[in-house]
Structure formats: C-alpha cells, structure tokens
UniProtKB/Swiss-Prot annotation:
Keyword Phosphoprotein attached: yes
PANTHER family: ARGININE_SERINE-RICH COILED-COIL PROTEIN 2 (PTHR22426), LYSINE-RICH NUCLEOLAR PROTEIN 1 (PTHR22426:SF1)
GO cellular component, one term: nucleolus
InterPro entries found in the cross-reference section: SMAP_dom (IPR028124)
Gene: Knop1
Quaternary state and interactors: Interacts with ZNF106.
Biased composition (Basic residues): 17-27, 73-82, 120-129, 154-165, 204-222, 265-274, 286-296
Keyword field contains Lipoprotein: no
One Pfam family, short name: SMAP
Interaction with ZNF106: region residues: 310-478
Organism of this sequence: Mus musculus
Keyword set, alphabetical order: Isopeptide bond, Nucleus, Phosphoprotein, Ubl conjugation
Protein known as: Lysine-rich nucleolar protein 1
Positions bearing Phosphothreonine: T314
Signal peptide stretch: none
Length: 478
C-alpha cells in the first residue's frame, strides 16, 4: 500500500516543476495585487473546493488525507507568520509618513531596502502557494461527511499549534527564509531606533527652546518694554502738563500784582509805553497847528470838513503814520477839489454848476440853507436802469433783494432821470421792451393740441393715437 501511494504521489509531482517555472514569471507581473491573493488563501475552504473529484479506493483516500493535513498545518503557520509581519510593516509605514512628511536620505535608503525584502518574501509565498495548489489538485475530496469533519479537526489543531509554538515555526522554515526574516526584523528595529532617536532629539530641542521661540520671547520682551516706556512717557507728560499749569497760574498771579507792591514788572512796562505815546500825540497836534498857520499866511482857504476831521483825530491815538506822495512837497488842495468835481460830474452824482466861493465863517449856514443833493443808491448796476414809475422801480429793487436795511421812502429828483453813464437810452430801452413783449405773446399763442403727453393739453371728445404708424396702436377716448 505504501509503495502504491508513493508511486501515485510521484506521478503528479513531476510535471509540477514545470508549472513552478511558469508561475514565477506570472508572479512578477502580478505584484500589485497582494491583497486579493491573501484573502483567497486565508480562507480554509480554498483547498477543499479547488481540487476536482476523482474516484479511488477508500484505502487510498485515508492515506492521502493524512499526508496533506500535516502539510496544510505547516503552510498555514508560515502564511500567518508572514502575513502578521507584513501587516506590522505596512502599519508602521503610514505612521512614519504622518510623523515625517519629508524623510531624510538615510531613511529613504532604509525604506528602499525594506521594500526589496518585502518583494522577495512575496515571491517566496507565491511559490509555496503554487506548490500547495498543485498538491491540492492531486488530492481527492470525498463526498462523505466524515472526511469533511476530519479536515475541519485538522484545521483546528493547526490553529492551536500556532498559538503554542511560535518559536519553532522559524526553525521549520528553510535557512534562506529564516535569514530573510531576521534581516527584516533587524531593519525594522533599526528604523524604529532611528525614529526614537530623532523624536528624542526633537523633544530636547523643544525643551531647550528653538531659535524661533527665542526670537518670539525676545519680541514679547521688547513689546513689553516698549509698552512700559510708553506708559512712563505718558505719566511724565501728564506730570509735566500739571507742572506747566501750576507754573502758568503762578505767572498769571505774578502779572496781576497790586501797584503798591515793590515788584510790579508788568505795570512798569505799560507805564513806559504810555509815556512814550504821549509825546507822539503832542507832536501831531503841534504839526497840525503849524500847518494851519502856514495856510493862513499863504491865503489858502481851508475846508470846514477837514477842520472837523482834524478835531476828531485828536481823540484818536496814532500808532503808525505812513507818509504819502513824497514827490509833491506842497499838497495843492485846490487842484484836488477840481479833480473830485470832474469825477462827480462824469458819474452823474452832481450837476455841472458854477464854481462857488467859500468863506470859512459862512460855510455852515450856506450848506444848511441849500437842499441835500442825491448821492445815488447802493444797488450797483441797477441804479442805471430806467423805470417809468417810481413804484415799478421799488418793486423791482425789492424783488432783487433791495431795501432790507434801508427805508424805501427816498425818491430820486425828476432832474436826475437822465444820466450820461446809463446803459440804454429811453428810445433803445422802449424798443427792447417791445421786442420782448412780442416774443412773449408769440410763445403764449402756440397751440398745445399738436401732440399728446406731458406739456400738451389734449382736446376733449377726440380720439388720438399713441403711434399712428403702428398697426396695433391703442385708441384712447376721453
């Protein structure tokens, strides 16, 4: 029986070597799909359903069932140990990526070597899986429920063995696989040690205080010092203001010292100024007296208005006196009067009258006896406008804003209706008024019934169109 089973087992094992070579090539292409393969392999029913049924004797069935049970348990142990190691590596990688986004070149080299080891492990696993698949294809699945129970029991035993024997699993592996696992573990430990060192260094730096933190502390200190200085400066300014106010009060108090006190500097200055000003006024009065004497000696007649002005000027105190035209050594009063009369004639304020003889004694009586002459209003250019009636003139001036502060009782004399400097004569003004009236009448005589809308009065009981050219115009009736 043993010989037959061995022969039966050797038969299907020969072509398996060829299949291994073919599957090696496939493994390189399918590296990017490790998760799907593991999910299929981890299921316990894979080897049971994959192999097609084959009719053999019951004695052969028993021997064949006992052989794969042992091999399955060993393979499952290998798969579990590899898968757990891979999951640890894959779980460690994302945590490292989170901790450090920009790894150092040393770390990159270590990661590359770890990736190479992982790829080699994957290849070896696929080889072992291919062997298991080939052996499973040679096995027979018995339709009896007893056979299924035996397989499930073997699976449970293998799980218990995995928990109890973790160390002997590495011994059961071939020497190359063991060396690879040890190298991977050493790399993983090295990486973890390097990360721990870097984290420790970062912690020390944080404890010591980075240069940025130091700069921030310095800035905060400077800001605090600046705030303290500002507060001190404000306090000092307020104190100085208070002191200044006290000093000003003292100075004001000193200025208002009574006259009896021995120290009165302000009053002394005022007195000296008054003393200086007094001789100036006396000097002016002396000069005026001298001028009067000179005029009497020369026989020049003096105006009463000038005398009054001179008398009123005595009350005023002259601070500064500017000299006028220095070219004329002697001011000719007669010439000045003649020039003023010519200006008045041209402006229309006074009529052309014969030169009058003035006497100093009778000047006041003659002026009182003569009626006051019209000196013109203060309305500027509207004084030159000619009006037919006095009422019309008053209305116009009121409309223009006149007589707000003056009484409208004054009237122009009839002789002053015509003046030389008027803008228009009577004839030209009449022509202008006629033309304006014609324009006004023409504008008012226009017919407003030509159109419709704002500004047009539509005739009642008539139909009109908004738009005659439009076909769909609306008819409106009143």
């Amino acid at each position: 029986m043993v010989s037959k089973t061995q022969k039966a087992d050797l038969g299907p094992q020969l072509p398996e070597k060829k299949k291994k070579k073919k599957k090696k090539k496939r493994v390189v292409a399918n590296v990017s799909e490790p998760e799907t393969q593991y999910s299929v392999l981890n299921s316990n029913d894979y080897f049971i359903d994959a192999s097609p049924p084959r009719a053999t004797s019951p004695s052969n069935n028993v021997d064949e069932v006992q052989i794969p049970e042992i091999s399955l348990s060993k393979r499952k142990k290998k798969k579990k140990s590899c898968s757990t190691h891979l999951e640890e590596c894959l779980g460690a990688e994302p945590t490292r990526a989170r901790q450090k986004k920009s790894p150092s070149p040393r770390r990159q080299a270590l990661e590359q070597s770890a990736e190479g080891l992982i790829r080699e492990k994957k290849k070896k696993r696929r080889k072992s899986l291919s062997k298991a698949a080939s052996q499973g294809s040679g096995l027979k699945t018995s339709p009896d429920p007893k056979h299924a129970k035996e397989v499930s029991k073997a699976g449970r035993k293998s799980k218990k063995q995995r928990k109890e024997k973790k160390v002997p699993d590495t011994e059961a592996l071939p020497p190359q696989d063991a060396w690879l696992y040890e190298a991977g573990d050493s790399l993983h430990s090295c990486l973890e040690g390097a990360e721990a060192e870097e984290q420790a260094a970062l912690g020390q730096k944080r404890k010591q205080g980075s240069p940025r933190d130091h700069n921030m502390k310095k800035k905060k200190k400077t800001h605090q010092e600046g705030d303290i200085l500002l507060v001190n400066s404000r306090v000092s300014v307020e104190n100085s203001l208070k002191k200044g106010s006290k000093k000003s009060v003292k100075s004001e108090a000193l200025e208002f010292v009574p006259i009896d006190s021995p120290k009165a500097p302000g009053k002394k200055k005022v007195k000296s100024k008054k003393k200086v000003e007094q001789p100036v006024g006396e000097g002016l009065a002396v000069k005026r007296k001298k001028k009067k004497k000179k005029r009497k000696e020369n026989g020049v007649k003096e105006d009463p208005w000038q005398e009054e002005k001179e008398e009123s000027d005595t009350d005023l105190e002259v601070v500064l006196e500017k000299k006028g035209n220095m070219d004329e050594t002697c001011i000719d009063q007669v010439r000045r009067k003649a020039l003023q009369e010519e200006i008045d004639r041209e402006s229309g304020k006074t009529e052309a009258s014969e030169p009058k003889k003035w006497t100093v004694g009778l000047s006041v009586k003659t002026e009182a006896s003569e009626p006051k002459k019209w000196t013109g209003t203060q309305f500027g250019q509207w004084d030159t406008a000619g009006f037919e009636n006095e009422e019309q003139k008053l209305k116009f001036l009121k409309l223009m804003g006149g007589f707000k502060h003056l009484s409208p009782s004054f009237s122009r004399p009839p002789s002053m209706t015509i003046r030389s400097n008027m803008a228009l004569d009577k004839k030209s003004s009449e022509m202008l008024q006629q033309s304006l009236q014609q324009d006004y009448d023409r504008a008012m005589s226009w017919k407003y019934s030509h159109g419709a809308g704002l500004g047009f009065n539509s005739e009642a009981r008539k139909v009109f169109y908004i738009d005659r050219n439009a076909s769909k115009s609306i008819k409106l009736q009143d």
